Amino acid sequence: MWNELKSAKEINKEKPFYINILAKDVFEIDTDETILVQGIIDLYYINKNNELILVDFKTDYIKEGEEDKLVKKYNKQLEIYKKALESSLKRKVVHTYIFSMQLNKLIEL
């Protein structure tokens, strides 16, 4: 990832966002109501191939081989980030990653 960032066309860090989404997409409830979600996207960039890449940094303590625990824990959060980014930029996120600080490893969702 670091090498790809060096040649990126555009890099954005710690960007706040707001998005209206269905409450049932966040909580296990049966409703068609929408809620306003706000957050901060750690990193997104446009690589040299003009692809939109989303990265979220996590500091959770996990052991090598337990990467799936991070994916399970944060998948819903990153889906919301992805929707927010795609909605605001009007383009598709090609890759979504968690960067585990503990493992110093990029994990694709």
Residues covered by each model-derived region:
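Structural signature of nuclease core domains in nucleic-acid processing machines
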Residues: 1-109
